[in-house]
Amino acid sequence: MKIKSSEFIISAVKREQYPDDNLPEIAFVGRSNVGKSSIINSLTNRRGLAKVSQTPGKTRLINFFLLNKDFYLVDLPGYGYAKVSKKEKASWGATIERYLLNRGPLKKVVLLVDCRHKPTADDVQMYEWIKHYGYEVVVIATKSDKISNNQIGKSEKLIKETLGLPKDYKLKFFSSLNKKGKDELVDYLFDDLVEEI
């Protein structure tokens, strides 16, 4: 699939602010600083589409981007940043949960984890949440340029074991810097969304 057009539509907090045209949605979620904005910009070929923040925990809203005028890519707030109050953390959690609850157009959720580290308790909880709400989960290990090829196997084993993924699960590794395998990843993530239209 070619991403021919991508445009920012709205930043939302409340359900009534979400787009209501019933186009399919794919949501991206992950810890603060996992490289979410970078991967969105990389996959859509738009450098500044999602704002890359130098301050972790900056994305507090749900951002909707319309791709090819066919479907929405939804950027959910980053979670797990230590330097915010419990109240603020709870607020982000509520924002994400509100979106996941009975969101008809949502077809799949992409969970991003940093391939250099063991998934955190927050990552595990997010994975469980997504499954609990009945959505397809795609796990992508980001920042793969930061580890060597022989560390990939170890990283894959650790991520699968920690999240409880099946042994035959096809975990995807991606680097927004070298963009290796980008076209295949775009097809893997977005093709079936368009088939449904």
Curated annotation (Swiss-Prot):
Q: Which GO terms describe its biological process?
A: division septum assembly
PROSITE patterns recorded: G_ENGB
Q: Which PANTHER family match?
A: ENGB-TYPE G DOMAIN-CONTAINING PROTEIN, MSS1/TRME-RELATED GTP-BINDING PROTEIN
Q: What is this protein called?
A: Probable GTP-binding protein EngB
Q: What gene is this protein a product of?
A: engB
Kindly give the SUPFAM superfamilies that the UniProt entry links to this protein.
Answer: P-loop containing nucleoside triphosphate hydrolases (SSF52540)
**Positions annotated to bind GTP:** 30-37, 57-61, 75-78, 142-145, 174-176
- Domain named EngB-type G is located at 22-195
User: What species is given as this protein's source?
Assistant: Clostridium perfringens (strain SM101 / Type A)
